[in-house]
Amino acid sequence: MALCRSLVVFAIVALMAPSISLATDFVVGDDAGWGLGIYYDVWAQGKQFFVGDNLVFQYTAGAHSVYKVTGDEFRNCTVPSNSSLGSFSGNDTIKLATAGNKWYICGVNGHCDGGQKLKITVLDGGAPAPAPVAPGPYSTF
């Protein structure tokens, strides 16, 4: 009887507990990192980016940079004139704080035109919640 009550309590707690979503760190370009000759549109296909996730740009410092830009700046490969808007460390983490389209380019001359740019769509909320745990066949309410 105590086991049945424990199972019922566990099932109720499992059903009532909010889903826990953990942030995901996405290394842009995976092992290739952030550089020339990588198709970032292909890299982003099939990935779901959620608010709270992180983009990690890994590259040789001084060889590349990362700028978060507008859609027009992305399409035209326009680097913002304010260099304080860029990241240059070679290991830059950008938290995805809001939902919507996000655009990133390399600010080194010719790199964006050469394909070093990334467009993603960030979704609101976390990953889907796991299915609730059903009580065992011998439990009663």
What are these regions (language model features)?
Residues L3, S19-V27, A44, F50-N54, ...:
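Plant P/S/T-rich low-complexity glycomodules
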Residues R5-S21:
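Cleavable N-terminal signal peptides of Sec/SRP-targeted secreted and luminal proteins
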Residues F26-G37:
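Short N-terminal segments immediately surrounding and downstream of signal-peptide cleavage
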Residues A32-W34, G46, F57:
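Cross-kingdom Sec-pathway N-terminal secretion signals
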Residues N54, Y59-T60:
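Short, surface-exposed secondary-structure boundary micro-motifs
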Residues G62-G71:
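Short, Lys/Arg- and Gly-enriched loop/turn segments at beta-strand edges
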